[in-house]
């Protein structure tokens, strides 16, 4: 028999026991009283906090929204058919978060950040970003001074958007709202190719799965998925998933913003998010207000949109930002931005309804799309008269500001005079000129979907249009004139375009533009 050495045995036992935990593991557990329609009432979680994540049997996550005397009301984030009365629920003692990292770019994820595009798990380092977070304080922000080029002539010239701005896209259904937002995303490819990417997040809230698949296909076709994350909460997802989807999009955008990079988030659309929130609130028996929306529906959108900001350039100030997630400490950089393009759908052009007026008052301007313009072939169907950008003017490049300064006013005047012109033909010469030039400007501002125009080409085209070098061109030939004019500039005057891009516009540049315009106009004159 082998010699058994007691000291060795006791040493092994000591080593084994040193790794075992002897303290009692305390878990707060509650019981489901009632479940249905994506909402559960739970008894026993007396210490639960508002906004806290809960874990149900089978790993399903929930979130506490209502704290009542004898129970808590929670929303269920996912498929809840396995949850029954009497099921146990555990507190997690953390607020709802989503894991974000560089590996998320190019992927389609759900509200909880899980990939749903069949391309496997998200790789690389991931950081915990809270879904709900306080917006950066005034000290940590800086004014909007840098343009966010959309590639859409009508927007970049007359309703410019700056990095860190919130610009609402509003209009009836089928007026091209999503197309405007996708154009803005596709136009960022120029910056991606240059090595200065603007990371884009497209949040699809309550849309058909087939529509979302089409949008992802469009982005892939134009090479835009290389710098885009799609957050999808389809119409078939439970209301809580649709309600939280924009918050997930904001959390993803904040990761890029707080690490010193520009990001653009599109919320498509917030009307459906408000409807989902109304559903959740009514199921939780919160008192209804106007149009049966809960009283805090304004706060729902304001706290979401306030998270868009241009962060102070100083790394030191940015690192001291309020409500910074623990996971980001040490990698925070200044100078980042998050631009928001929320979309709102109106009913029969009624911008004075509850949700549209709320979001108009929160944002820094709106782009109003009109069904009549859309049907008459003006696309993008932007009504210039009631579309505004409250801060973007400071962000325009100098050359664009100089050239497009009067364009908005001219077009508003043209619309007014055109309405009068229908009643009588005896118009004086200056009125006729305004109408004729307005028609040509209108043609110049038309643009097919998914074909963004670079800023220097926009400046060149708008210069010749507003200064009357196209007055001799037949209206229906304006688009052909534009195509030829830009081709000549691209082939023979690359330096001029480069100077315009840098913001410069002087007599030498305008002489080149005049000369080329006159040469090309001969071909398309009456």
Curated annotation (Swiss-Prot):
Keywords: ATP synthesis, ATP-binding, Cell inner membrane, Cell membrane, CF(1), Hydrogen ion transport, Ion transport, Membrane, Nucleotide-binding, Translocase, Transport. SUPFAM superfamilies: C-terminal domain of alpha and beta subunits of F1 ATP synthase (SSF47917), N-terminal domain of alpha and beta subunits of F1 ATP synthase (SSF50615), P-loop containing nucleoside triphosphate hydrolases (SSF52540). CDD domains: ATP-synt_F1_alpha_C (cd18113), ATP-synt_F1_alpha_N (cd18116), F1-ATPase_alpha_CD (cd01132). It is an enzyme of class 7 (translocase). It catalyses: ATP + H2O + 4 H(+)(in) = ADP + phosphate + 5 H(+)(out). Produces ATP from ADP in the presence of a proton gradient across the membrane. The alpha chain is a regulatory subunit. PANTHER family: ATP SYNTHASE SUBUNIT ALPHA, MITOCHONDRIAL. This is ATP synthase subunit alpha. The lineage of its organism: Bacteria, Pseudomonadati, Bacteroidota, Cytophagia, Cytophagales. The gene is atpA.
């Amino acid at each position: 028999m082998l010699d058994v050495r007691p000291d060795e045995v006791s040493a092994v036992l000591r080593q084994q026991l040193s790794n075992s935990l002897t303290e009692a593991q305390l878990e707060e557990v509650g019981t489901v009283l009632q479940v249905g329609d994506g909402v559960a009432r739970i008894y026993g979680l007396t210490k639960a906090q508002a906004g806290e994540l809960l874990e149900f049997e089978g790993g399903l996550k929930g979130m506490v929204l209502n704290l009542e005397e004898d129970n808590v009301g929670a929303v269920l984030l996912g498929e809840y058919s396995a949850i029954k009365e009497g099921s146990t629920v555990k507190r997690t003692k953390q607020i709802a978060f989503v894991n974000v990292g560089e590996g998320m770019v190019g992927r389609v994820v759900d509200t909880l950040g899980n990939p749903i595009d069949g391309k496997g798990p998200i790789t690389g380092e991931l950081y915990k970003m809270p879904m709900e977070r306080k917006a950066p304080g005034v000290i940590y922000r800086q004014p909007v001074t840098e343009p966010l080029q959309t590639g859409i002539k009508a927007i970049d010239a007359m309703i410019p958007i700056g990095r860190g701005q919130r610009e609402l896209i509003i209009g009836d259904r089928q007026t091209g709202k999503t197309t405007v937002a996708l154009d803005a995303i596709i136009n960022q490819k120029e910056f991606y190719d240059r090595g200065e990417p603007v990371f884009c997040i497209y949040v699809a809230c309550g849309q058909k799965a087939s529509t979302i698949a089409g949008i992802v296909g469009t982005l892939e076709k134009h090479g835009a998925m290389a710098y885009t994350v799609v957050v999808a909460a389809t119409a078939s997802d439970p209301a809580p998933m649709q309600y939280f989807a924009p918050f997930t999009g904001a959390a993803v955008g904040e990761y890029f913003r707080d690490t010193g990079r520009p990001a653009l988030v599109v919320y498509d659309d917030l009307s459906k998010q408000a409807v989902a929130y109304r559903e959740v609130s009514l199921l939780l028996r919160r008192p209804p207000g106007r149009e049966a929306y809960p009283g805090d529906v304004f706060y729902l959108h304001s706290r979401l949109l306030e998270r868009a900001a241009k962060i102070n350039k100083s790394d030191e100030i940015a690192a001291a930002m309020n409500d910074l997630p623990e996971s980001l400490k040490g990698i925070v950089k200044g100078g980042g931005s998050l631009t928001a393009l929320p979309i709102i759908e109106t009913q029969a052009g009624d911008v004075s309804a509850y949700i549209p007026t709320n979001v108009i008052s929160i944002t820094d301007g709106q782009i109003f799309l009109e069904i009549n313009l859309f049907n008459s072939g003006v696309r993008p169907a932007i009504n210039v008269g009631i579309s505004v950008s409250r801060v973007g003017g400071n962000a325009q490049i100098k050359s664009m500001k100089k050239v497009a300064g009067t364009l908005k006013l001219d077009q508003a005047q043209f619309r007014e005079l055109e309405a009068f012109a229908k009643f009588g033909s005896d118009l004086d010469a200056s009125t006729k000129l305004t109408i004729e030039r307005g028609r040509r400007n209108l043609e110049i501002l038309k643009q097919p979907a998914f074909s963004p125009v670079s800023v220097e080409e926009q400046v060149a085209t708008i210069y010749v249009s507003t200064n009357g070098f196209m007055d001799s061109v037949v209206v229906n030939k304006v688009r052909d004139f534009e195509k030829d004019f830009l081709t000549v500039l691209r082939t023979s005057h690359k330096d001029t375009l480069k100077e315009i891009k840098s913001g410069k516009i002087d007599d030498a540049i305008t002489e080149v533009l005049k000369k080329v315009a006159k040469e090309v106009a001969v071909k398309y004159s009456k």
